[in-house]
A protein has these predicted regions:
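N-terminal targeting or regulatory segments adjacent to alpha/beta-hydrolase or S9 domains
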Residues: 1-42, 301-304
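Short beta-strand element of the alpha/beta-hydrolase
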Residues: 58-62, 68-79
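Cap/lid segment of the alpha/beta-hydrolase catalytic domain
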Residues: 84-136, 193-194, 200
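Gly/Ser-rich "nucleophile elbow"/oxyanion-hole loop immediately N-terminal to the catalytic nucleophile
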Residues: 119-162
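Hydrolase active-site cap/lid region
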Residues: 169-215, 272
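Short beta-strand/loop motif that positions the catalytic acidic residue
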Residues: 236, 242-244, 248
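Acidic catalytic loop of the alpha/beta-hydrolase fold
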Residues: 246-251, 279
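Histidine-bearing beta->alpha loop at or near hydrolase active sites
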Residues: 270-281, 288, 292
């Protein structure tokens, strides 16, 4: 039985955060990167402004040969990884945005809690918790794509694994313009369930924090409920696929099953991979993700 419960003021809290963010101009900047541009893919460094006026960096790739308006994919990073340059997605026919939320490389001048520490930074106060701005940084990535004349606004997808999988869930929930989503081994889903099921980092950061500050447990539980992907899941309306590893000791599969049950979309599919840990069957699953996005964003036949 999951411990995840949605706070009564969950919607009001995030509506207020969105109001604060919408009052801040996006101020997008797109800088050509000739060093990383090739014959078939144009590469740019992108910057835009997010909550608390923090500048967020991203890599932006687009096919040299493309339609006037092209489908787009936003890629979201894992907890300890920095965003890759998404040229392989551009070669598949998409415009691709690889976002570096606050604290990641090139987005860490104004906010840099480090790793480990992001997960517990201000964890006793939902109004200042690190993931409050971190989530908005990713949602503003969709806003950036919608601002680009070369992007087809009705064909935007989002994907990521681990932390990127959790961010895929929250982004699909909070940006209705997302047409399709693929979340792998989703982290940030079932926080308090996970800390009881695993003693592997990053979730172990929360156990460490509560051992040092035992009086904080109630405040920690209260805060993370507002950021738990499971509490966002019923807002998801777009087609979505989720893959989990049944031997995952980083993001326990129990949390993946709970998440999937709560997803509101009618078009949803869960892929559980036995014999796999936190990789969540990535090698086997990549072709499924490719077919899924090709069907929903490129109108190409394929089954996912």
């Amino acid at each position: 039985m999951s411990k995840v419960r949605k706070p009564d003021d969950f919607a009001a809290f995030w509506d207020d955060v969105e109001r604060q963010a919408s009052a801040i101009a996006l101020e997008p900047e797109v800088v050509p990167d000739p060093l990383r541009t090739s014959d078939d893919v144009e590469t740019f460094q992108v910057f835009y402004t997010s909550l608390e006026h923090i500048r967020i960096a991203a890599w932006y790739c687009r096919p040299v040969r493309r339609a006037e308006r092209t489908p787009a994919i936003m890629l979201l990073p894992g907890y300890q990884m920095d965003p890759p340059i998404p040229k392989e997605w551009a070669r598949k026919g998409y415009i691709a945005l690889s976002v570096a939320p606050r604290g990641k490389l090139r987005s860490n001048r104004q906010f840099n809690p480090g790793y480990p520490n992001l997960l517990t930074h201000n964890i006793v106060d939902r109004h200042t918790y690190a993931y409050r701005g971190f989530y908005v940084d990713t949602w503003r990535g969709i806003d950036f794509l919608l601002s680009r004349p070369e992007v087809e606004p009705t064909r935007i997808g989002v994907t990521g694994s681990s932390q990127g999988g959790g961010l895929t869930i929250t982004t699909a929930a909070m940006r209705r313009q997302v047409r399709a989503a693929a979340a792998g081994a989703p982290y940030l889903c079932g926080f308090m369930d996970a800390v009881g099921l695993t003693h592997t980092y990053p979730y172990e950061e929360i156990n460490d924090y509560m051992r040092l500050h035992p009086e904080s447990r109630h405040d920690v539980e209260t805060t993370v409920a507002y950021f738990d992907g499971i509490n966002f899941a019923d807002r998801i309306a777009c087609p979505i696929i989720v893959n989990i590893g049944l031997q995952d000791n980083v993001c326990p599969p129990e949390t993946g099953y709970t998440l999937f049950e709560r997803i509101g979309a009618r078009d949803k599919q869960l892929y559980p991979y036995d014999g796999h840990g936190h990789d969540a069957g990535r090698v086997r699953h990549t072709a499924i993700v490719d077919r899924f996005f090709a069907r929903h964003l490129l109108d190409r036949d394929g089954n996912a």
